[in-house]
């Protein structure tokens, strides 16, 4: 019923959407419904953290996306607020044609950031990743410029914001200003249980605060999980107090399996696949771990015993936002002969003409020379992002260079399909797999820690979840929870 109510609701909307609940589907459906009802000149903006997510929204909307802003959070404030109105807010000494490469232009204070922009023509960034200069600047411009406020107010009737749990404090402040001062309706969706990026500035407290305290939003909870089978849903919900009421106990658990850690990992896998036959070795099978060295060790041990596992590493680009997806597509094009310029173009938000695609190809082809260097990489990225009118972060340049200058991460850009893979939990966020193995000792849920990481890990599994029970405190905690909740069946031991 909530989904139908969301579509009909004309107010500010806050949606908490658990793993596999179809949050992108409801976001797109709501956009389509609002645009169909809209008989005015107003448009909508749909913003998210990555170009990949924006591209997915744009693709699902199809023709409906035309005339509306579909892109990243950074792209929205830069193209709709900062560039058009910085002169009106701060004077003609401030450039609107600033460059987007930051390099060493990091600073500690807002005033220093303004000086870098004014005198060096560069939109810089704070040295502290938990502070967001671009969003502080955009909010300052709105407060100083009547024209900017009038423009945003007269153009947008609603702004849709994805993955709100990953917003930082400065993003939150700007979005609340749009709602409170400009009276623009907001549709925000997220899941605090999936916030695993606090280390890079995300503040799930912003989202939680709105859930608990705000009276300006009509609040909805999407609890149906269309990804995971019921056994896996029950198990993942057990460890979060707010989701325990969603557990639907079954008479028999078949798809969440506990196995003791009393033998090598290769023997555990043989027991699961051959002796007990609870896993299908001919189907997709993924092992999720917390640390890179742990993944490499497991891969070596398994492959020495005749298995064929590939570790898909989290690359430095996975820690660089918001353009990590686009930069990874560029590397695929450079390092993989099977990946064409048209594959890359398909991942760029917006409809590119044949001429634009050829111009982009010409820029990127400079990276195909045998001996690339830092200077060449810098220049190519500057030219590419200038062409696409996207801001480039110095951390992204550093990460891109690190990946390009070594073969260490090449497997992450291989377009071949591998059945048996090992991921870290952070690199697996947003993905889903048929069969998943996790290790209990990776998660200190019994100390009320790692609960978000545990939730993300368990909800990557669609059909089968295996827990290697190598931590007695973890298993004791499960028993305690089962007794408290009077649950008899949550995991099957073999």
UniProtKB/Swiss-Prot annotation:
Domain UvrD-like helicase ATP-binding: 1-229
Alphabetically ordered keywords of this record: Antiviral defense, ATP-binding, Helicase, Host-virus interaction, Hydrolase, Nucleotide-binding
S-S bonds: none
Biological processes annotated in GO: defense response to virus; recombinational repair
Any one GO MF annotation of this record: DNA binding
SUPFAM superfamilies cross-referenced by the UniProt entry: P-loop containing nucleoside triphosphate hydrolases
Pfam families listed in its UniProt record: AAA_19, UvrD_C_2
Phenotype when the gene is knocked out: When this gene is missing the Gabija type I system does not confer resistance to SpBeta in B.subtilis. When this gene is missing the Gabija type I system does not confer resistance to T7 in E.coli.
Domain of life of the source: Bacteria
Site residues by UniProt (Interaction with GajA): 147, 150
Gene3D superfamilies (UniProt xref): P-loop containing nucleotide triphosphate hydrolases
Protein residues bound to ATP: 17-24
Domain notes: Contains a UvrD-like helicase domain.
Subunit text: Homodimer. Interacts with GajA; 2 GajB dimers dock at opposite sides of the GajA complex to form a 4:4 GajA-GajB assembly (GajAB). GajAB interacts with Bacillus phage Phi3T Gad1 protein; this interaction forms a 4:4:8 GajAB-Gad1 complex and leads to GajAB inhibition.
Similarity comment: Belongs to the helicase family.
Protein task: Component of antiviral defense system Gabija type I, composed of GajA and GajB. Expression of Gabija type I in B.subtilis (strain BEST7003) confers resistance to phages phi105, phi29, rho14, SpBeta and SBSphiC. Expression of Gabija type I in E.coli B (strain ATCC 11303) confers resistance to phage T7. May be a helicase or contribute to GajA activation.
Name by which UniProt lists this protein: Gabija protein GajB
Source organism of the structure: Bacillus cereus (strain VD045)
Lineage of the species this protein comes from: Bacteria, Bacillati, Bacillota, Bacilli, Bacillales
Annotated gene: gajB
